[in-house]
Amino acid sequence: MRRELMKMKINVDKSLIKAVKTGKVIIGANRTVDAAENGSAKMVVLASNCPADIKKKVQETNVPVLEYEGTSVELGPVCGKPFTIAAMAILDAGESDILAATA
C-alpha cells in the first residue's frame, strides 16, 4: 500500500511540474482564492499546511480541490520555484493530466 501511495505522489508531482511548464497556473493564496471565486480556476492545489481560512474560502467555491500531501515547503520546489507554495490554481493544465486527479 505504501508503494502505491509513493507512486501516486510521484505521478501528482510529475503532473504538477508539467502543468507549470506547459499550462497556465497562478501561485499565491490570495490570487488562488480570487481565481476560484471568479471561476477562472479549473482546479486548486492546496498544500497540507495551507492556512485554514484559505482552505475554507476555496472549498466554498465549486472548483475541484487537490489536497497535496506535502507541505508548502515541498510544493514550491516540486513546481520548480525557490519559495514555498501554500496554494495554487490551475487555469490551463497544458499537457498535464493533473485535472484527472480529482475526477
Curated annotation (Swiss-Prot):
Top-rank lineage group of the source organism: Archaea
Database matches in Gene3D superfamilies: 3.30.1330.30
- Which Gene Ontology cellular component terms are annotated? cytosolic large ribosomal subunit
Q: Which residues cross the membrane?
A: none
| Entries under PROSITE patterns matching the protein | RIBOSOMAL_L30E_2
User: Which Gene Ontology molecular-function terms are recorded?
Assistant: RNA binding; structural constituent of ribosome
The biological processes this protein is annotated with in GO are: translation
Family annotation (InterPro entries):
Ribosomal_eL30, Ribosomal_eL30-like, Ribosomal_eL30-like_sf, Ribosomal_eL30_CS, Ribosomal_eL8/eL30/eS12/Gad45
Q: Which UniProt keywords apply?
A: Ribonucleoprotein, Ribosomal protein
Please name the Pfam families in this protein's record: Ribosomal_L7Ae
Per the database entry, which stretches of residues form a coiled coil? none
Please state which protein family the record places this protein in.
Answer: Belongs to the eukaryotic ribosomal protein eL30 family.
Q: What is this protein called?
A: Large ribosomal subunit protein eL30
Q: Which organism is it from?
A: Methanosarcina mazei (strain ATCC BAA-159 / DSM 3647 / Goe1 / Go1 / JCM 11833 / OCM 88) (Methanosarcina frisia)
